[in-house]
């Protein structure tokens, strides 16, 4: 029997072990999509206890605690941090096969030097050990980032954000990890939302451009893109329930905008036309600026209305949308490509059943402007586990060039989650090592080194064009 999560965790063959320990493990981390707060980096926050780090905003964990019958008081409520940690430790015992089990223990091993097992019985021991360790200067946010060998972080930022904390970090020569904004304009696109008109007013004030038409909306966003670019931004991100494409005319879009601007509701057809026009318009701007466009789709959000009204969004009540919008996705990419204005694009679906569909769509729009110009993103959210990652990479290998894959991102709100890159790299090396051991790929050291180091880090550096 193998030891629990030892140095060869998830690595079952000599080749997999060699590829991980000699190549993948040594590579830095480029975290090109996450949800961490730049203010906490700028202020070099130190956490008082492990609950603040682990349970402060992690809806992955909250979801499983609810599944274990834990009262909301101990999840997002007013229970003490020690009580919340106890409930999480008791929940973790039941999480056999869940990536949270592995992530939690990787974090305990790497950051706290704890190689034991966290459960209800050991919770007090782990609580005391972690909290004592968190008081050390080495466990401040900046030092956690540095010891994780992170070279660059892209946060997630709304067009109206001031980016003041990015500026603080930009001016601080004592911290050499780049922390760059990433453009997330969902609120400017979501015309159906009740708060949309209030958002337009904020955008008008921040941009200095009165937004009272679709054309002026795009002008205001271009103004903010210029500001974001001045702060080092070269990455956008869009969260879509599905990728839509509905043919439209400029006159139709202006009429739809005017209808909504007057306070009237719009139809689903009108919403999809508007969002199509929005995505095409900003996509062209990304291409002009050589920005990368990320599209995350396949989510049905905030399904539990009772809890949403209590807790708000991003609290653990989202699910997979199984609608296959591959045809619309191809039409959308084609609309940009037809005028030679398709930017580098990364496509992530929360629905794992469309891995092959994405793999074939991206093959339709590659060109010589960039290696792997259109990428399938790493297994995301409900799929970033061993099976999900293995299936995504296997599908990508079957249909595209896995060697050009840009690899992993944390998509996290936690400063301990960089171990997810290690987790991914172990799974990737196990997959590739298995192919080599089975005679499906040669034991070509030079080629394997290039592929493993590329997927781990180098491909992303080249793809995004960051100065590293």
UniProtKB/Swiss-Prot annotation:
Top-level taxon in the UniProt lineage: Bacteria
Keyword line: Isomerase
Principal EC category: isomerase
Gene Ontology terms, MF aspect: glucuronate isomerase activity
Reactions that this protein is recorded to catalyse: D-glucuronate = D-fructuronate; aldehydo-D-galacturonate = keto-D-tagaturonate
The keyword Chloroplast belongs to this UniProt entry's keyword annotation: no
EC number annotated for this UniProt entry: 5.3.1.12
Pfam family, one: UxaC
Pathway: Carbohydrate metabolism; pentose and glucuronate interconversion
GO terms (BP aspect): D-galacturonate catabolic process; D-glucuronate catabolic process
InterPro entries linked: Metal_Hydrolase (IPR032466), Uronate_isomerase (IPR003766)
HAMAP family in the cross-refs: UxaC
Family: Belongs to the metallo-dependent hydrolases superfamily. Uronate isomerase family.
Protein name (Swiss-Prot/TrEMBL): Uronate isomerase
Gene, per the UniProt record: uxaC
